[in-house]
Amino acid sequence: MEDVKLEFPSLPQCKDDAEEWTYPMRREMQEVLPGLFLGPYSSAMKSKLPILQKHGITHIICIRQNIEANFIKPNFQQLFRYLVLDIADNPVENIIRFFPMTKEFIDGSLQNGGKVLVHGNAGISRSAAFVIAYIMETFGMKYRDAFAYVQERRFCINPNAGFVHQLQEYEAIYLAKLTIQMMSPLQIERSLAVHSGTTGSVKRTHEEDDDFGNMQVATAQNG
């Protein structure tokens, strides 16, 4: 594939007067990026409506599994726009398939001056993984750097091992996707031609090896 230079926006840096993390803060939401908040379900409960409105929240991503639907629910559908994802906090759960729709949801909100809260149950594993994925793709970051950035703002995050593995895999996926999006039709055509030529060369090499092997067998039999 031809070299394509990808450009990403600068990552906002931590405020000098950032509040020092304390254990009770895990029950609250934190602003990870301007307009993007991460927190537990307790930060989106009915009793927290005044706080959500104070921070200007307009969109909420609610991450839960079916068995949690009775107590983790969209409480303000008449006030906020929701994206509800059915995802278990299980290492074998495929979360990569949801990354594109969550990025589109967050981007759409921020570009229109809105603010987004991403929450699961505890705000530690599932929701943290999605915020990390968003930051990786938006700012062109590796998993470990995006994790560290989010952890500076919400210290208690701890995506499960399966989610970590998928986030590490996602780096190559989003870079390839963005590279293709940046390429012109001519560049894509050239890249496909180069790939096809390489495949053809390999195929011809295998065929030549087979022909040579058959010739050796025939020679031995005739000898």
Curated annotation (Swiss-Prot):
Widely expressed with highest levels in muscle, testis and brain. In testis, expression starts 13-14 days after birth and is limited to the seminiferous tubule and to round and elongating spermatids. Expression is low in condensing spermatids and pachytene spermatocytes, and absent in spermatogonia, spermatozoa and somatic Sertoli cells. It comes from the Eukaryota. Catalytically inactive phosphatase. Acts as a nuclear anchor for MAPK1/MAPK3 (ERK1/ERK2). Modulates cell-fate decisions and cell migration by spatiotemporal regulation of MAPK1/MAPK3 (ERK1/ERK2). By binding to the F-box of FBXW7, prevents the assembly of FBXW7 into the SCF E3 ubiquitin-protein ligase complex, and thereby inhibits degradation of its substrates. Plays a role in spermatogenesis. Interacts with MAPK1; independently of MAPK1 phosphorylation status. Interacts with CARHSP1/Crhsp-24. Interacts (via FQQ motif) with FBXW7 (via F-box domain); the interaction is direct and prevents FBXW7 interaction with SKP1, a component of the SCF(FBXW7) complex. Its main location: nucleus. It comes from Mus musculus (Mouse). One of its GO terms (biological process) is regulation of ERK1 and ERK2 cascade. It holds the Pfam family DSPc. Residues 199-223 are annotated as: Disordered. A motif (Interaction with FBXW7) lies at residues 76-78. This is Serine/threonine/tyrosine-interacting protein. The gene is Styx. It is found in: Nucleus; Cytoplasm, Cytosol. Keywords: Cytoplasm, Nucleus, Phosphoprotein. Disruption phenotype: Males are infertile due to a disrupted spermatid development, resulting in a >1000-fold decrease in spermatozoa production. InterPro entries: Dual-sp_phosphatase_cat-dom, Prot-tyrosine_phosphatase-like, STYX-Interacting_Phosphatase, Tyr_Pase_dom, TYR_PHOSPHATASE_DUAL_dom. The modification Phosphoserine is found at residues 184, 201. Changing residue 120 to C: Confers phosphatase activity. One of its GO terms (cellular component) is cytosol. The keyword Cell division does not apply. Belongs to the protein-tyrosine phosphatase family. Non-receptor class subfamily. PANTHER family: SERINE/THREONINE/TYROSINE-INTERACTING PROTEIN, SERINE_THREONINE_TYROSINE-INTERACTING PROTEIN. The keyword Phosphoprotein applies. Residues 28-176 form the Tyrosine-protein phosphatase domain.
